[in-house]
């Protein structure tokens, strides 16, 4: 009888210990479930953050694509402006060559005019000298008259040459006026072309400044993409670590649940054994 009581006490103590262990296992299981739920919330938060970072990365890539498109358009505009500058330079060169030829023709016409003026002056001097010469020698009168006739003929010829020279001079002056007008027109065109060239130069400077700003924006976008990529990798690494932690916690929860089931089965076995013992004692 004493042995049975001792056995019952031992079984009761073992039962109490089993209940304590079961409660501890249940508490551990609850704690593990809480940790698992917290880890799952962290995983969901990380996944949401990853999605947000991916969206931001898409936006940055779209902005970069738009910046590249604008940069290509500006490069095309720069090439067009450079072509316009080259065309203007060719036009300026042609105008300068035309101006040089006009100046050369003007020099030639001026030289011819000076020669004609000198010839006319010489003829006029000879005519005046012959007209005002007074010769009293009758023997030389006939010769002088012949000379006078010749001089008159020469004077008339000189007059004709003078008229021709005057006519040519008028033509040369007209050509000179036209050349001066062309030169003035050329100078006006040169001024206009220089103004156009200055405007194109300013446009080129503006395009260069815009290109530098576009390059700076592109570098900033690339830097932002690198930062976003780094953040994405870090978030993915944290997500993987959290998933591994969740898996470990789930394994721990499974192990604790198995231990709890084992303790419950053990408790049930002890309870059945106690019931059987009480039944035996009662029958006894």
From Swiss-Prot:
Q: SUPFAM superfamilies, per this entry? A: Tropomyosin (SSF57997)
> Per UniProt, which keywords does this protein have?
Allergen, Coiled coil, Repeat
Q: Which Pfam families match?
A: Tropomyosin
UniProt remark on domains: The molecule is in a coiled coil structure that is formed by 2 polypeptide chains. The sequence exhibits a prominent seven-residues periodicity.
What is the recorded function of this protein according to its Swiss-Prot or TrEMBL entry?
Tropomyosin, in association with the troponin complex, plays a central role in the calcium dependent regulation of muscle contraction.
Subunit-level organization: Homodimer.
Q: What is this protein called?
A: Tropomyosin
What species is given as this protein's source?
A: Dermatophagoides pteronyssinus
